[in-house]
């Protein structure tokens, strides 16, 4: 039952993305010469099937245009993981690919980097949502997302997306009764504003 709901959810997202009109005005999208792409996003993860970890995040990305459709740069964020009572600061390389150079366009966003932990309250309790007091030497973070943008001016756009955010953490494994490295996923819905500023 849970698997069917999961498939229906992604089918609905795919239909929305494919239904975005790609024939909007050509001159109302970003112009690479007008500055870098800045994105401020707010995401919220919710428990769904195997994605039972709830997570809320605030992120800022600053990316350079390689052409009209592709950007790459760096980002930083703040995330709170509810079940683990954990706060993290992810730092990453980020890229956006916009399918159309139009006012309204689907896009893909990829992020890869690491994260620091600034607060963890559930450690060494040998419970399901417990973290090891000593973590791995490298904390891997990566995310893949898709969504669409809509320009309200040539330099400002609103964005909506769904993403899969992963954090590599040494967490308690209830099947093995031990702390092991686990890739914890968060299925997130996000809204964002993106903008260009001259020389920034």
Predicted regions and their residues:
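Short glycine/proline- and aromatic-enriched beta-strand/turn motifs that initiate or cap beta-hairpins
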Residues: 25-72, 188-200
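Extracytoplasmic loops and strand-loop junctions of Gram-negative outer membrane beta-barrel proteins
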Residues: 41-45, 126-132, 173-176
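Predominantly the C-terminal beta-signal and adjacent terminal strand-loop region
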Residues: 150-200
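Gram-negative (and chloroplast) outer-membrane scaffold detector with strong preference
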Residues: 61-142, 150-156, 189-200
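Generic short beta-strand segments
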Residues: 42-44, 76-78, 163-166
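Cleavable N-terminal export/targeting peptides
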Residues: 1-32, 197-200
């Amino acid at each position: 039952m849970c698997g069917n709901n999961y498939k229906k959810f992604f089918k609905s997202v795919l239909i929305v993305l494919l239904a975005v009109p790609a024939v909007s005005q050509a001159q109302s999208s970003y112009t690479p010469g007008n500055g870098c792409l800045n994105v401020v996003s707010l995401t919220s993860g919710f428990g769904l099937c195997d994605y039972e970890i709830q997570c809320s995040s605030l992120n800022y990305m600053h990316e350079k245009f390689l052409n009209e459709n592709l950007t790459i740069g760096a980002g930083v964020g703040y995330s709170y993981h509810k079940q683990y009572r954990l706060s993290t600061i992810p730092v990453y390389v980020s890229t956006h690919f916009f399918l159309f150079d139009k006012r309204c366009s689907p896009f893909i966003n990829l992020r890869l980097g690491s994260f620091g932990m600034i607060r963890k309250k559930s450690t060494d309790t040998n419970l399901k949502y417990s973290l090891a007091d000593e973590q791995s030497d490298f904390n891997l973070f990566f995310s893949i997302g898709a969504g669409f943008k809509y320009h309200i001016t040539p330099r400002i756009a609103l964005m909506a997306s769904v993403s899969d955010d992963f954090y590599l953490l040494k967490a308690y494994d209830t099947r093995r009764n031990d702390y092991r490295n686990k890739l914890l996923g968060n299925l997130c819905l996000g809204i964002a504003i993106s903008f260009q500023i001259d020389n920034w």
